Amino acid sequence: MSPSTETEMEDTKPSVVENGDQAVSRFAEFSKNELALDEKSCKEAMDLFGETKHLLMANVSSMGNGTIEEAERYWFAFILYSIKRLTQKNEESEKEEIENTGLTLCRILRAAKLNIADFFKELPQFVVKAGPILSNRFGSDWENKLEAKEMHANTIHLKILSKYYKRVFEEFFVSTDANVENESSVTGRVSECHRFGWLLFLALRVHAFSRFKDLVTCTNGLISIMAILIIHVPARFRNFNIQDSARFVKKSSKGVDLLASLCNIYNTSEDELRKTMEQANNLVADILKKTPCLASECETENLEDFDKDGLTYFKDLMEESSLASSLNILENDYDQMTRNKGELDERLFINEDDSLLASGSLSGGSSVSAGGVKRKYDLMMSPSKTIISPLSPQRSPASHANGIPGSTNSKIAATPVSTAMTTAKWLRTVISPLPSKPSQELERFLTSCDRDITSEVVRRAQIILQAIFPSSPLGDRCVTGSLQSANLMDNIWAEQRRLEAMKLYYRLLATMCRAEAQILGNNLTSLLTNERFHRCMLACSAELVLATHKTVTMLFPAVLERTGITAFDLSKVIESFIRYEESLPRELRRHLNSLEERLLESLVWEKGSSMYNSLAVARPALSAEINRLSMLAEPMPSLDEIAMHINFSCGGLPPVPSLPKPETLPAQNGDMRSPKRLCTENRNVLAERNSFTSPVKDRLLHLSNLKSKLLPPPLQSAFASPTKPNPGGGGETCAETGISVFFSKIVKLGAVRISGMVERLQLSQQTRENVYSLFQRILNQRTSLFFNRHIDQIILCCFYGVAKISQLNLTFREIIYNYRKQPQCKPQVFRSVFVDWSPARRNGGARHRTGQEHIDIISFYNEVFIPSVKPLLVELGPGGATVRSDQVPEANSKTDGHLVQNPGSPRISPFPSLPDMSPKKVSAAHNVYVSPLRSSKMDALISHSSKSYYACVGESTHAYQSPSKDLTAINNRLNSNRKVRGPLKFDDVDVGLVSDSMVANSLYLQNGSSASSSGAPLKSEQPDS
């Protein structure tokens, strides 16, 4: 391999000729002239900019379009946003706080000519680069004070809620978009009513909810506002008939039950809706000074044919004479409540044309949509289409999930809001009715241990769930008048979520005990007395509850931090959750699958992961490097320590000393090095939970039934001490078995991502084999390259290394450009790669640097990757031995210290056979599945013997016309009365439907039995809300 092959790469960084001092001058002018900052704030901003200007100059090319002008605008906004958020948290003088009034994020963005999507897309890079400086200036908890992730998630919530509100509003009232000239006065009034509803909703958020409330609660709030509008907006503006039996299905002799009908349409809880509507009514009375009266005592056209029991009516609330003044009052109230918080003005979301809501670009500034222009919603959801989205629409639309039954809207695809409400309904109807204590079956398992551990299990659940869903001190933030404390509402919310998580935990624990008993017998002492196992179960239960409600303030990995476990611990129970909870909605199954993928790609490799404790035992040759980098997990905090940090305001917990410390429990995890994630350095960069983005639709770990039909290894071995012999025999320790399973998952994930990039880059199958072989060898022989990094960083380098050694015409720029189009892409993957320049790791390309830092992926490739993997690359080159992956021996004796494969290592294997299709069942009534089709399978599927089983767009039975026409033809054939091969009787109710698992398994068997699903999703543009 020639030196030029090793390190000569295209330079993607333009030279920065701008002097840092000139940037300082421009920033000073921007702060004073554009934003009119007061002297104190301006000085603070100038000081922070001066400290970080070298970072700006070094990262110009990686921000926005790569020009100095745009990079400066981003950096100006980041600095001012940080100053506003972090200094106001430290202000003790109310006078000083008021002096800085008016510097909101909206003002900053407008002055910098940036939109919201682009700002939050680039902000993580600033957080990584400037993190140490911000920590020195504002304290180690600066990131919690900044609340950047919460603000971003909150922004996405508001975006989809505003679209949802507009759609629902227009289902009941005339459209606000009408352009007919003679209807301008009508649409003007309706538009005012529409704005009134949104302002009342924001008042509800400000006064009654937390600042960052979950999506389900906010949706309940919007539906309660809609109920108020329905009975107050003048009847002449209605777009519905009260006698519409398909819309208002809940009726009695007294008339239509409005709230029950709305709950039926939008899957909301009637109890929660009534409580929220009562809060909204109180707001109308207290803020707008309107006098409430019982609807049953009012005679008005608006209430005709409604059941008036339980409804409150305000005379003249929406009449023209008072509407304008009410709007002004609500506007002023919002200004007063939010004017000094430095946040976004949430009123702007009602105006879709606002420049701040303009579409941002995907993944670093380049448009990547191959199918046309993406909608604003898609781009607001995330700067990059990542895998971690609890807001992704369901694949199979519910019959009435997103519209009024029987109306034209009832068949459209599920939206983030309707999906959230459907999933919340599962939690409400399936989990909430369960008892909040162990069932009799579970108690039998708990009492059959060497000692009765029932009380320990109950107490642990209370402590851990109290830590995850803490109660706020009462009266901490009360509002004036008769309105309730927002923190009182938070406490009620937290108690409800604790109960849901506890009931789910007990339910799953009983199911898992039943399954483990089939393997180990009825005595499950070793598993049920394992502290880490229970905390993982509780964390996973809580995460499902949080994902169901789309909670903004508890973004993953918060549950790990609050329970004292790590990503590696949690990854051991995810598959069991999916396997054993059969009622789990598809959305939550997908959430767990994508969560596992996220754990594998980066979180498990972070500093402080318990994976390193096992790896040091399974791979002794790596222990020195693990210890040098301080990668080992710290001891898991005891329940006593966690309990000390909790305010047990609800009481009912036994005294703390009654429970022995985890270190003394008989079946603990050996050395108790079960971790608490203390490493905050860069922990949120590559693994940030952008929980509201479009997901990789079940690309990996797609369906649990695609995995081996053999019984999984007992859970107790997964949670046993790393040095303990594996009960399954074979002479392995539990650490070796665990690392072997973990590495096999990494290899499968790598195979899926490599395959996706190969197809996108249109490379040969031999190149795919070489990249995959190199990736496996690095994992097994240069494992430390993965430490503190994202596996995609290694994959991208593998592609370029193989391209150079194979003399392919492929630049790193092309690789990164195409990687941006991958659904899991995050810009930080190629912009910020961890490196350690200590003498033990220094090589010829390190330029005598010292310490640790984050560099771009090209620098990482040249200075770290190539010096380490050069011998492995040489083997793949035309001048080398060209070793095929299936010919590599299990043990390699090369002298790197990391090269010898250990018993815990997976064997280097040829590229696995991955299922090509990820079927989507498109109808609950018909056995019809739709799946993307790879060109490699086209010939086989449309051969003479099999083509009748498939309908392929453009290639089925006639020449390609267009997707629309081909799909129409397919639909016509499916819906025709012509009998196709007798057994396929879609309209016969007695014919059993083919299950999703049967389809998945058939694909699995066709494509081999050793891989997980890659399942490229069927591409479709998602709805706006």
From Swiss-Prot:
UniProt-annotated stretches for the region Domain B: 737-871
Keyword set, alphabetical order: Cell cycle, Nucleus, Repressor, Transcription, Transcription regulation
Region annotated Domain A, chain positions: 415-615
Subcellular location: Nucleus
Gene3D superfamilies for the chain: 1.10.472.140, Cyclin-like (1.10.472.10)
Family the entry assigns: Belongs to the retinoblastoma protein (RB) family.
Function in brief: Regulator of biological processes that recruits a histone deacetylase to control gene transcription. May play a role in the entry into mitosis, negatively regulating the cell proliferation. Formation of stable complexes with geminiviridae replication-associated proteins may create a cellular environment which favors viral DNA replication.
This protein's name: Retinoblastoma-related protein
Organism: Medicago sativa (Alfalfa)
Primary gene name: RBR
